[in-house]
């Protein structure tokens, strides 16, 4: 099949959230399965320093009364063609840049549509989040081009009806209430990034006021769990951690813990229960819940706690003050550093993800990959990847709690801390987590099926397409 990914982000060179990981990884796996996969994204001002981009464009287009250029390069580490839409609107040195976002990304979506009509015609356009939401509307009258729309985060829905009509000149009845709603209405297939999240967003609690529409289109709505790049995130070969190891050589992992304790200014002690937390410091990630019980948990136990992330100033201040109250036991780094995050995955005993909601979640998968036992709230993709440890039957790969309540999180942390004291059992728990297949392979096969459904292609002739 000929598949064009259209997205605002692509890892590793233009990433803000999980969408970038998907767009940077899934096309490579689909390419290996024999499909002609290409990526279309904005030519941001910072990309020249990260990619080898030719000076001359391959094509000139016209959209929304503006000319634009398209440049061709390749996705790093692959032979997947990468098309960059060049226009002064994308020159700012950041992906999301303020009040003109609605116009910029609607223009980008229109440019992708023009590119597909006039330069390279795919069978399927795979659209990602609200930035590309108008593409299914414009492609609705193109019988030879189908669309698949992926919801990465329903909370961000794009410009609403009054502004969208002004930007696009499309009548309101073609738009829905936002670009997200327009995509849900007109895309041939819609999916989220985990099966559980696909069910949850059809309820008022998680539906962000679109639960009625999502229930209405449930026949074309599905959930496909994200994967991770298991070659890049491999504790046996990762050059950014102190000691390499695998699930059969877990004894070597201790060197990473001791090095992390030293790097973070903690007491260097192999017997301390070390918990890692890497996330944006916002309410979605459960930071408000954590702050209600962390002081009590640290005073009750001898555990250590490390935080890496940035976010809302109030949460940053609270975490910083807690770290000053527990020197040698808690460390807070208000920044993001990819190398340090990997060292936290490799050196922590457990990894906390207490999210209020989580479409998929990548950090718990990385924790499993590196042998850090995840402690999570059962929501979204966390339900599909982390299963509660049952010591009676040697089952599960982490610790889970259900209600978004301080007592539930506190109880779960205490249970994990107590279990850590029984090292033979804990190491088996780590090994079960490291044995989970977290690659993109199964997800890519599911996307193949989704594309086939979108274009009406029988699955038995999929490989011949």
UniProtKB/Swiss-Prot annotation:
Q: Which GO terms describe its biological process?
A: glycogen biosynthetic process
Statement: the UniProt record of this protein carries the keyword Glycosyltransferase: yes
Organism the protein comes from: Synechococcus elongatus (strain ATCC 33912 / PCC 7942 / FACHB-805)
Q: What is known about what this protein does?
A: Synthesizes alpha-1,4-glucan chains using ADP-glucose.
What does the record give as its pathway?
Answer: Glycan biosynthesis; glycogen biosynthesis
**What is the protein's name according to its record?**
Glycogen synthase
Check the record and name the SUPFAM superfamilies matching this protein: UDP-Glycosyltransferase/glycogen phosphorylase (SSF53756)
Give the EC number(s) under which this enzyme is classified.
2.4.1.21
Q: Which family does it belong to?
A: Belongs to the glycosyltransferase 1 family. Bacterial/plant glycogen synthase subfamily.
Which UniProt keywords are listed?
A: Glycogen biosynthesis, Glycosyltransferase, Transferase
Q: Which reaction does it catalyse?
A: [(1->4)-alpha-D-glucosyl](n) + ADP-alpha-D-glucose = [(1->4)-alpha-D-glucosyl](n+1) + ADP + H(+)
